[in-house]
Amino acid sequence: MNGLVLGATGLCGGGFLRHAQEAPQFSKVYAILRRELPFPATDKVVAIVERDNSKWSQLITNEMNPQVLFTALATTRAAAGGLDKQYKIDHDLNLQLAQAAKEKGCETIVLVSSAGAHPDSRFGYMKMKGEIERDVIALDFKHIIILRPGPLLGERTNSKQSGFGGNLTAALGTRVYRSRFQRLLGYPVYGDEVGKVGVHLALNTSGKDKVQFVSSKDILDISASLEKIAT
């Protein structure tokens, strides 16, 4: 089985890549990126660096043959230069690449969305995330796993990629992480946990609903269960 990771230089995408490369079910894990990986990878990982993301769909080939697509591909309004430009990355590029992967036989997609995502939201960010979810579901993959994390924690390689809530929320999130106050801040979660849970769910789809929505609390609970099994 081969996997494909988009957004592998980010918190969640990096988590996808690290945990997918450790899973024996994957023979190869491809990553399409604009820059080199910021962390070491095993020989199982094939990193394809192409700065022009308009060419990315052409890189998803029959030879790659990804059975699972993990996408944490996203930017921020500040990094993109406005919501319209952010939409072209977060929504349009994600959909284009998901469609390309499906045409090459991909059956499972794992999408990082956001807590509060809804296509009818009054808030631009939540509306965009909801529209991504809606349109990914419409592509009709065999298995669709939508992760909805709250504030993301972890060390970022790009200061502009502050994501949900920005640096202040992340700082507060670290303080309440897995505490009795975590609900007040939307269950902050580490990007690596999001990646770990996404890989686990992608490899365990038997008997599950075609479309799975996984909340931030669910991610924390599943991650904790996996840690107990590992020890």
UniProtKB/Swiss-Prot annotation:
Residues 1-44 form a transit peptide. One of its GO terms (cellular component) is mitochondrion. Keywords: Membrane, Mitochondrion, Mitochondrion outer membrane, Transit peptide. It is found in: Mitochondrion outer membrane. The keyword Transit peptide applies. The keyword Disulfide bond does not apply. Pfam families: HIM1. Coiled coil: none annotated. InterPro entries: Him1/Fmp52 (IPR014843), NAD(P)-bd_dom_sf (IPR036291). Its main location: mitochondrion. It is a peripheral membrane protein. GO terms for biological process: import into nucleus. Present with 1340 molecules/cell in log phase SD medium. Belongs to the FMP52 family. This is Protein FMP52, mitochondrial. It comes from Saccharomyces cerevisiae (strain ATCC 204508 / S288c) (Baker's yeast). The gene is FMP52.
